[in-house]
């Protein structure tokens, strides 16, 4: 069991800033070297959305971590670990005025099966992570960015040809899972990332 007390956690927030176009500098036409346009006092005010880092509120994080590992006599083994977290600074999707929530917090667990000898080893790993708040802002405007729950299956192995030569391979995301990012609710899709299955030798 663990408890973390967080203070002055840095979060990004967005606010609108106005800019008087009439106060801008002259635009020079590079082909002629003359002013292509001049500011006009009647120009409309331009509004820009600025993303700024701010000190967040205090928060408390409680959680449990558990890890188990066992190796059998024949070289096979298993490893499992998991984390469960809870915080008093979680995102409320119905509160559009909320300016603080801890980012990156979520439950997760990993399961690994392996086989090892003096000459070679192979590992199969399954990883799962629950959805979490990545950011309280979006590039498209107001609202949080949430990464939905994700699972991944990986494999790796190696063979020692000699004391100085080893052959290695690794396969990432064997089941070709997608990463989904959304806004406040599940129908607010922001991004689908397909990194595909990847191999390295």
Residue ranges and their predicted role:
Residues 5, 12, 128-137, 158-201:
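C-terminal beta-signal and adjacent terminal beta-strands/loops
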Residues 54-57, 144-147, 190-192:
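Outer-membrane beta-barrel proteins
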Residues 13-19:
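C-terminal regions of RecA-like/P-loop NTPase motor modules
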Residues 9, 77-79, 112, 121-123, ...:
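Residue-level detector of the transmembrane beta-barrel scaffold of outer-membrane proteins
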Residues 2-3, 19, 24-137, 175:
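Gram-negative outer-membrane beta-barrel transporters
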Residues 66, 155-158:
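Short, basic/aromatic-rich helical patch in the C-terminal catalytic core of site-specific tyrosine
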Residues 136-145:
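Short, surface-exposed loop/helix-turn segments at secondary-structure junctions
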Residues 59-61, 106, 150-151, 196-198:
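Membrane-spanning beta-strands of outer-membrane beta-barrel proteins
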